[in-house]
Structure formats: structure tokens, C-alpha cells
Amino acid sequence: MLHIKIVAVGTLRDEWQRLGCEEYKKRMGAFCRLQIIEVPETKLPKNAGAAQIAAALQAEGRRITEQAKGSGLVALCIEGEAVDSQELSQKIQRFASNGTGSLAFCIGSSHGLSDEVKNAAVWKLSMSKLTFPHQLARLMLCEQLYRALSITAGTPYHK
């Protein structure tokens, strides 16, 4: 069975987001083993400079790659490939059929992901050209992963 990790910087603050992610995790249990891993966000002052932000991204990147170890790392980033739900389903299936038994979808902080994480990625994925709060992106990713796995399984969720 495919193992999917969502490695996200920071915690979900709102109950509705947590409940939504838990619901999709429960639904995905029929298709894969989903693990949601939260890594600590590096605290920065409000007026943080570029060097401080870069250092924070590197520290977060180390925590992300440690949790993603042994998995094909998928970086969610603005410069990634934008796909529709069918294409996401096909991409996940290609990884699984090529022997990638575990995928780690990585969501950065509000400052994004470090270059090290992006360079280590087997795939860079963009959710949209729009900007979303990273907590909402996590819920949206859960829904899209469920949709993609439902497409592969041939269940009627995706219309």
C-alpha cells in the first residue's frame, strides 16, 4: 500500500482545518497510509531581513528533509508544475509504479521552502497561481490527494 506523508511547517490553528484534514485522512485509509507530520516553524521578528529568512528556511528545510527521508519528496511551491486532478492521479500512479512506495508532500512556512528542499524534490507541484495560507493549502492538498486516489480507484467521488 502506498505511503503518503504530508510534511508541513507549523500547526493548524483552526479546528475546522484540523477536522477537515482528519476527515480526508480517514477517507484515504482505503487507498493509502497517510501520515501528517508537523515540523516547527522558525520564529522570526516582524522586521526580519533576507539573511534571517534564509537561515530560517534552511533550518526548516533540515527538519522537512529529515521527516521526508526515504520518501520521494514533492515540494509544493509557486514555481512547481500546475496540474489538474486527473494529472495528479496519474503522476502519483507513475511514482507508485516506478517503485516509489512513499511520497512526502512538503508544505513550507509563509516564506516558502528552502532551495535545498526544492533541489531534493523528485517533483515540484504548484497548487495554483493564487496564493493561499499554508494552513489552508494543507487542507486543499488533503482533498486533492483523496480526489486523485479516488480517480485511480474508480470511485464516484470525482465527477
Predicted regions and their residues:
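N-terminal beta1-alpha1 ligand-phosphate binding loop
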Residues: M1-M28
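Conserved RecA-like P-loop NTPase ATPase core
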Residues: I6, V74, G108, L141
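General small-molecule cofactor/ligand-binding pocket signal
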Residues: V7, Q35-I37
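Short glycine-rich anion-binding loops that position phosphate/pyrophosphate groups of nucleotides
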Residues: L12, I78-A82, S109-G112
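Short glycine-/acidic-enriched loop or helix-start segments at secondary-structure transitions
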Residues: W16-R18, D84-Q86, S114-V117, L136
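Positively charged, solvent-exposed patches that mediate nucleic-acid binding
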Residues: L19-G20, A30-Q35, Q90-I107, H111, ...
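S-adenosyl-L-methionine/SAH cofactor-binding core of RNA-modifying enzymes
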Residues: R33, P40-L103
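Structured adenosyl-cofactor binding patch, chiefly the S-adenosyl-L-methionine
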Residues: H111, D115-K159
